[in-house]
């Protein structure tokens, strides 16, 4: 699967937020000025047009979840097809990705690390090995670290880090057994208020 391999800190500066959650692992501020865009003229922030704001928000969310453009557009089409609020549907679809669920359960420090665990066949879903990061997790599905992967230092470190963060209410995790359950779809109030999904809906609705 294609994925972005370029400089990630530069993208975080472009969007003005810690896209890849590096600050949860190491001090990002010491090496990355999030309030300043990259480049020689990064400090000169002009007023964005409505289209510019919509595009920036789409890029931000796409990069947070590690999804390329074509796949992100497909998520939007599916969200628009479903009943209910299209923007909220979009966020729920992104939250159902296996790599995201592995991250939310605290088995990985970042979504990128979670993608690695999935791709390297370290994850069981309902008792079966799944190595597709975009695999859709449904309510009541179980996600377990494979026995031979349970001693990986990065998983142990991630669980320790997760103890310092607010725990998602839509997943249940047994840190000792290294297994979890996706209890329900997250509600909009469960997710980051820094995301304005309506801007994405406006962008794709044109």
Swiss-Prot record:
Q: Where in the numbering of this chain does the S4 RNA-binding domain appear? A: 96-156
* Entry GO MF terms: rRNA binding; structural constituent of ribosome
Keyword Protease applies: no
Listed A to Z, the keywords are: Ribonucleoprotein, Ribosomal protein, RNA-binding, rRNA-binding
Q: Which SMART domains match?
A: Ribosomal_S4, S4
- Extract one GO cellular component term from the record: small ribosomal subunit
Q: Relate the protein's function as given in its record.
A: One of the primary rRNA binding proteins, it binds directly to 16S rRNA where it nucleates assembly of the body of the 30S subunit.
- Spell out the family assignment given in the record's similarity comment: Belongs to the universal ribosomal protein uS4 family.
User: HAMAP family attached here?
Assistant: Ribosomal_uS4_B
Q: Subunit comment for this entry? A: Part of the 30S ribosomal subunit. Contacts protein S5. The interaction surface between S4 and S5 is involved in control of translational fidelity.
Name of the protein: Small ribosomal subunit protein uS4
Species this protein is from: Pseudoalteromonas translucida (strain TAC 125)
